[in-house]
Amino acid sequence: MVTSTTHIPMLELLGEEKALVGFQNTDYISSTKTRNRIDAGFVKELGNEAALNTESLLELRPDAVIGFTMDNYNKTFNLIEKQGIPVIVNGDWREETPLGRAEWIKFFGVLFDKERLADSIFNTIEVDYLAAKRIAKENTKYPSILSGAIMRNDIWSLPAGESFVSQFLLDANVNYLWKDSKGKGSLQLSFESVLDKAQHADYWIAPGYFSSKAQLLENNPHYKNFAAFKNNNIYTASTKRGVKGGVVYYELGPTRPDLILQDLIKITNPELLPNYTLTFFEQMK
């Protein structure tokens, strides 16, 4: 059993999707292959995001539970281990680079005795990522980038300059307007300060959970003051979803940073990748 949708693409790439027997809130899963197994009854629903159904999990008796935890203590995991089911903590979310996170497929390679296959898959992803990064260096326009949106209490949340997302934008060779800020998480800024700095930004990438311009205006009518809004240069990854609403970007993206980087290059400098079709992002309408 795994506890994050980000683990599912790695299982599938290794040909081990049949090892998944249960998941917490299966609606989040977007993969067609695994959704077919859910519909066929091979993957049991084990509760929602707030509470894992430990009773159902214990009935399944999986060989192991692959989990993640934000600290060194997890009451549910301790209970599972006391019942004789090993809990293996996956630390991929701690990685600070796109390729570092993707490399965790090697972790699953060890578990399934498929180290050589996992190495081969990662090496291909790494080669493709670095090739895209080299292509991005041919960019001569260096467009300016805004990201994030107002999430709550009129505070705009956007990636800090040392964050995972900022690294993608750096490798795409664009001018992320907060690239020089400190921190590896998110910056919490006022709307006014963001408007002052990014009103004329060329592109607005990943505007939070919003999937349409109408939703943005409903949240805050002042979004219309951004040039990227006026020029239809907003791109979101929230519209490509599985049949139950799971966002493809959140599930597949950590395993395929090469595709995320190519998306960003295609958006900001489409002439550099003339034959590439966007995988995760879509132009917001």
What residue ranges belong to the model's regions?
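N-terminal ligand-binding lobe of clamshell/alpha-beta domains
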Residues: 1-285
